[in-house]
């Protein structure tokens, strides 16, 4: 079957490659059902959000290959990739996805640990004497 839209989504260190095809609403992540891959309801809602925002939850089958990061980051990357693929498939989806903030890459990353400190911001305990 022909791919209608292909999109790449990113969140933190997770990267998701997404293909959408005409179908009946099946979402597959790394060859597993989305419900089996993401354990929490919040992660499932996040992944399906672009489909609900464009009222396409029963119109397309979504195939996602995601790697890197943790499950929350991967869920965000999937949502970003699905949103981009939906725009490629049908440009009329762009307005509703942009309004929901689903096409914007979340640029927040983990701040690096600095030398001479315990963490990114936390310092070692200070002793006056």
Curated annotation (Swiss-Prot):
One of its GO terms (cellular component) is small ribosomal subunit. GO terms for molecular function: RNA binding; structural constituent of ribosome. It comes from the Bacteria. Keywords: Ribonucleoprotein, Ribosomal protein. GO terms for biological process: translation. It holds the Pfam family Ribosomal_S9. PROSITE patterns: RIBOSOMAL_S9. InterPro entries: Ribosomal_Su5_D2-typ_SF (IPR020568), Ribosomal_uS9 (IPR000754), Ribosomal_uS9_bac/plastid (IPR023035), Ribosomal_uS9_CS (IPR020574), Ribsml_uS5_D2-typ_fold_subgr (IPR014721). Belongs to the universal ribosomal protein uS9 family. PANTHER family: RIBOSOMAL PROTEIN S9, SMALL RIBOSOMAL SUBUNIT PROTEIN US9M. This is Small ribosomal subunit protein uS9. It comes from Treponema pallidum (strain Nichols).
